[in-house]
């Protein structure tokens, strides 16, 4: 293992030891940086989206810019104040961009979809073309990756083009494991990176990642796009083309010079637009990369349906309604059976040396739902 590859692995380890149940988010962010692409993390407040992004940025000796976006955020706050001297001496509107987004190499915009129309066009030019129109001059922007965080997906049409420029999307959920919740309490408040890399080292990593051979997986990639199309999920040519680089970078992150079928799993975080499409996209991809995870998706769909059934039960009056009580017992029994099936699938995956990250995630979701139902019954 080369020195820079060793550094990358150390960064990955440090992040995973502090940010519990965030392995996928960390891999997505690092892949995004290697690919010179952008990532948006979605999720409820308090799931450490912002803290994780800051921590990842702290491992890179780069110009960093961060801003919380509101409906009232001005161009001055993002792109720099107007130069009074230029205005007085030359009658030109020029911004002093040093220390602001146009000079950043790594950037983070919190509540990113609250950006107003007055700054959207400039943001699009920066993240897509890496240029900023400063008065009558065009400035090159050294941006490597822009990270966004939001509690929700954008709904306004004018934001959709902006959302599309984030190649990677990930819904971040709260910690589910009781064991990890105990660990969380004991963690230091402040994350302190031990391993850092320079921009020069990062560029070297990017060069090496670009050399990864993808010949063996091209056919599978085309097949995934075709199957998603059959499921009415549209992948633009631009997004499809960019996904190739993402696969290369993900393979490199995993220490490979040739992309393997499992590297296609990074596409789970690229090929969806609506949250409702995540399961379909994952199912199509896992059907090719990991049959065990694909089996788990069927169980995840059943769990989703059982959760929906729970919505029609009046929890407050459960002790007074025998029908609702019996329904709750039925759901609990089904969940117990699903958990046994999931454990069986997980054991088979381990025997066959396949990844179990996604399986573990669904098992945790099952346990969480089971505990919720048992809590209701225990209160009766």
Curated annotation (Swiss-Prot):
InterPro entries xref list: AAA+_ATPase, ClpA/B, MoxR, P-loop_NTPase, RavA-like_AAA_lid, RavA_ATPases
A molecular function GO annotation: ATP hydrolysis activity
Highest taxon of source: Archaea
Disulphide-bridged cysteine pairs: none
PANTHER family assigned to the protein according to its UniProt record, in alphabetical order: ATPASE RAVA
UniProt name for this protein: Uncharacterized protein MJ0079
Organism: Methanocaldococcus jannaschii (strain ATCC 43067 / DSM 2661 / JAL-1 / JCM 10045 / NBRC 100440)
């Amino acid at each position: 293992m080369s020195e820079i590859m060793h550094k990358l692995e150390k960064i990955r380890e440090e992040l995973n030891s502090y940010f519990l149940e965030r392995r996928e988010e960390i891999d997505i962010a690092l892949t995004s940086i290697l690919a010179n692409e952008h990532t948006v993390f979605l999720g409820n407040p308090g799931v450490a989206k912002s803290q994780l992004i800051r921590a990842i940025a702290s491992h890179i000796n780069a110009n960093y810019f961060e801003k919380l976006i509101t409906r009232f955020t001005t161009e001055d706050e993002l792109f720099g104040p107007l130069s009074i001297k230029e205005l007085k001496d030359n009658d030109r509107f020029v911004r002093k961009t040093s220390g602001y987004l146009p000079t950043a190499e790594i950037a983070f915009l919190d509540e990113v979809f609250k950006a107003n129309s007055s700054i959207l066009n400039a943001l699009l030019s920066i993240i897509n073309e890496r240029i900023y129109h400063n008065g009558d001059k065009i400035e090159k922007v050294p941006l490597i990756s822009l990270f966004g965080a939001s509690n929700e997906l954008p709904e306004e049409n004018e934001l959709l083009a902006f959302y599309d420029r984030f190649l990677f999307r990930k819904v971040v959920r709260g910690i589910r494991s009781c064991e990890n919740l105990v660990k969380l309490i004991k963690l230091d408040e402040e994350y302190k990176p031990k391993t850092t890399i320079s921009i020069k080292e990062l560029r070297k990593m990017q060069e090496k990642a670009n050399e990864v051979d993808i010949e063996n997986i091209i056919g599978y990639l085309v097949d995934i796009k075709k199957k998603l199309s059959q499921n009415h999920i549209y992948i633009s040519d631009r997004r499809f083309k960019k996904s190739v680089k993402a696969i290369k970078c993900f393979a490199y992150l995993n220490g490979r010079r040739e992309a393997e079928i499992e590297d296609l799993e990074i596409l789970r975080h690229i090929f969806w637009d609506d949250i409702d499409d995540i399961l379909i996209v994952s199912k199509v991809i896992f059907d090719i990369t990991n049959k065990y995870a694909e089996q788990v998706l069927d169980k995840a769909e059943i769990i989703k349906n059982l959760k929906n059934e729970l919505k029609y039960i009046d929890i407050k009056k459960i002790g007074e309604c025998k029908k609702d009580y019996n329904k709750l017992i039925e759901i609990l029994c089904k969940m117990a059976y699903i958990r046994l099936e999931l454990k069986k699938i997980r054991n088979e995956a381990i025997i066959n040396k396949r990844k179990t990250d996604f399986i573990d995630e669904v098992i945790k979701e099952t346990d969480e739902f089971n505990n919720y139902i048992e809590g209701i019954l225990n209160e009766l």
